[in-house]
Amino acid sequence: MTDWISDPQVCAAAQLLKQQAVIAYPTESVWGLGCDPGSLTAVEKLLRLKGRSLSKGLILIAANTEQFSPFLGGLEPDALRRFQTPQQKPTTWLVPNNSSAPEWISGGHDTLALRVTDHPLAAALCQLFGGPLVSTSANPQGQPAATSAEQVQGYFAQAVGVKALDFLTPGTVGGAVKPSEIRYLLSGEIVREG
């Protein structure tokens, strides 16, 4: 098993994230595009690259629940336990927005989309970066999500200037066949089957 936390390319990617870069990296089921959620410049670059609207909101991933602490304030103990309980499949929780995240992450919605990633490389990126990352599928709007590094390169190789991808990590996607399940934390209602 690769020790991604000390991999030079993953370390380089984490440093680039701190400089408003947009990177591509593998997740549990598809390749993702990621950036610093606190940087409007980086988020706008990612959205231009993908051709996605700011109003849709974005998923954040983290290496552990502690990295999401600012966004979990105000949750009832039962809801917090549900969020902290490992799931059998990748699950993105829609958590009440306590106004800790910038509006460009929430898209102006009353929830935030948060997932603790099980993918070792993605988790290492979050650890090295020091917090959550934006995570959206690596594909232009309307195209299938990339499942290989080659597909990511095919989608974004022609991009130049402000639409250019800054870095492509090593690695492969995990074993999940479908994208993460999305469900409301408080009601348990499933928005997207995983």
Across the structure, where does each feature detected by a protein language model lie?
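Active-site-adjacent structural elements in enzyme catalytic cores
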Residues: M1-G194
